[in-house]
């Protein structure tokens, strides 16, 4: 057993013991709250892995124009661009989860993120995304400036963040300002303005616009932790903070991600603003705005017609289980997510807006497109929503923030959804959303644990930051808990990701089957997904 796995199992056991004690005390005083554990994408994901649908009898085919597979950021961005250009005869198959990693959690009148919870203010290079936000009324003016004007109600409200450090809460997530931290952030200010010998920004979002200068791209040959050590950074608090940022954005720590990715996180957006765009339900709010803007209409079932035509784009609750391209169309076998009924569509063009690891399992002759099964590491996450019938008691002088982080924790902290509500009085009930990136062992080993772990162990991981902040008394406020397991939540930008041959091949492919996903950038943020969605839509329109 390797050291990483021993460390992971030891930490699991320690947290489980602490959680068991916390639960025992809670059970003695209260009835345990309902707990739902959702393994998102199962069992369909394993059926696709095992090629369960390749020999399925085919139903009668129906013809359609443009078909989008998926409903995450790339899919809805592609649909936004198509409808903006007048292409409205579009079918969107939602995929296994509505809105993908931007899903919402809903409990009665309460809303919270079920996945991604914020959008950083987009860089000047994110032209299409800025246009999209302007279309939605979120970006009010200055779309071409360094920092445009955004609608105040869409920006994170104060207090934005706090860190529990040495037994006390403080405002900033960086624990201390010391010589190392000042040196590091002075470097970041220079890197924000740095250009390679080809004249392009060294660090840009979208990442494909970054410089290809070999001297800078050499950073992609070592890990961020190795680079930090080489450059003489020793401050424990700075190193913890940088590792936390990597886990928060990439699902893996500084010892696992590329040095280029580690610096890109801080330098790519160019502007100095730390504000973000967010809503109570996270990026599900943005997804819903895009659905409404695009006029996307849900259909319980497709009409029984040989040729399908729609005046407005329609959405069906189905997932692609097989894709085959021919000379004059793309044949897609869809499975209804509820009934399991199979539908066969022959589309003139298809935008495949799903993770590349999934596309490699469902596309016939996947290697033709550069898709290779088993390539790329994906980080497993827990996104856990704690429904509270009252707010936990804060210490004297302490104020709950939107983002609440515990120094030294294996978790990523918790989000208070109610922070974004516009109201005079604090609501009686609320939701705290806890995030955990499980990077303590090899992702495959973690996924095996996630499949078999008892609910109490999962809850222990989910609740570790909340019990660290409030102690056992936290459970007295808990009404219910929902744990979403995202076993392949995001692609990890490990050393070598900039020159990944698979990604280069898929990006270069041109045919009736277009790929659009943040995976094409080697890491997962909304800006990258939106970029690839718009790129795919432009190729659809160019082919007529």
Language model feature labels by segment:
Residues 14, 20-24, 28-57, 166, ...:
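Conserved flavin/dinucleotide-binding core of flavoenzymes
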Residues 60-72:
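Beta1/beta-strand and adjacent pyrophosphate-binding region of the FAD-binding site
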Residues 1-16:
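N-terminal secretory signal peptides and thylakoid transit peptides that target proteins
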Residues 109-194:
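Dinucleotide-binding Rossmann-like beta1-alpha1 core, especially the glycine-rich loop
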Residues 316-432, 469:
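Mid-domain catalytic core of redox enzymes
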Residues 83-106:
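Glycine-rich FAD pyrophosphate-binding loop
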Residues 203-319:
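Active-site/ligand-binding neighborhood in enzyme catalytic cores
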Residues 75:
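N-terminal Rossmann-fold NAD(P) dinucleotide-binding loop
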